[in-house]
Curated annotation (Swiss-Prot):
PANTHER family in the record: MOLYBDENUM COFACTOR GUANYLYLTRANSFERASE
GO CC annotation, single: cytoplasm
Name of the protein this chain belongs to: Molybdenum cofactor guanylyltransferase
Reported cofactor(s): Mg(2+)
Protein species of origin: Methylibium petroleiphilum (strain ATCC BAA-1232 / LMG 22953 / PM1)
Residue positions binding Mg(2+): D101
Annotated positions binding GTP: L12, A13, G14, K25, N53, D71, D101
Gene that encodes the chain: mobA
InterPro entries: MobA-like_NTP_Trfase, Molybde_CF_guanTrfase, Nucleotide-diphossugar_trans
Enzyme class: transferase
Length: 203
């Protein structure tokens, strides 16, 4: 059994926020607190230690009380940059990533990913859930919700340094367990309008 104390949680807040007009998405208010802090508070009970991957307004993120690390890849590899930061900085055998813009992810997310990874002797485990853009019941991978063995660091460094940017192309090189979830907890806010709508739809 993979205990929570063996897992480092990483909140991914290093994106450019282009679909939100360039604002720092993780600092946008959701139910009165910043999105990234909401994600952090939801993640902390599920793991042993946490950190945030951010590239702007670092002092604001540091005020949340956990380590904040910017991307080490100057070419901006997207979410994989956050994966890389987590694997480089973690002192645990496992790392789990969650994006800052999906504030209502399940409170048993990490436990279910860990169970599947161990049961299938996989190198990583990720969420699979229906997407709002798909037909009802059509699940697809949600790769930013991912539990990884820390031993994958060398593989990811090679992939990113070779110009790789797509998560699915990297994960396809490894044994990956898919864990099915309902769609609702994974609704994310890509625009400010979607964020306001999410606030009114969730109780």
């Amino acid at each position: 059994m993979i205990g929570a104390e063996h897992i480092t949680g990483v909140v991914l807040a290093g994106g450019r926020g282009s679909r939100m007009g360039g604002v720092d998405k993780g600092l946008q208010p959701y139910r009165g607190i910043p999105l990234a802090l909401h994600a952090l508070m939801r993640l902390q009970p599920q793991v042993g230690t946490t950190m945030i991957n951010a590239n702007r307004n670092l002092a604001a993120y540091e005020s949340f009380g956990v380590p904040v690390w910017p991307d080490t890849d100057p070419d901006f590899a997207g979410p994989l940059s956050g994966f890389l930061v987590g694997l480089e900085r973690a002192e645990t055998p496992f790392v789990v990533t969650v994006p800052c813009d999906t504030p209502d992810f399940p409170d048993d997310l990490v436990a279910r990913l860990a169970h599947a990874l161990e049961a299938e002797d996989a190198e990583l485990a990720m969420v699979r859930a229906p997407d709002s853009a798909d037909a009802p019941g059509a699940p697809r991978p949600q790769p930013v919700f991912c539990l990884l063995r820390s031993t994958l660091l060398e593989s990811l460094v090679r992939f990113v340094h070779a110009g790789g940017r797509k998560i699915d192309r990297w994960t396809a090189q490894h044994r990956c367990a898919m864990v099915d979830f309902d769609a609702a907890p994974f609704f994310n806010a890509n625009t400010l309008d979607e964020l306001r709508r999410l606030e009114t739809q969730r109780v």
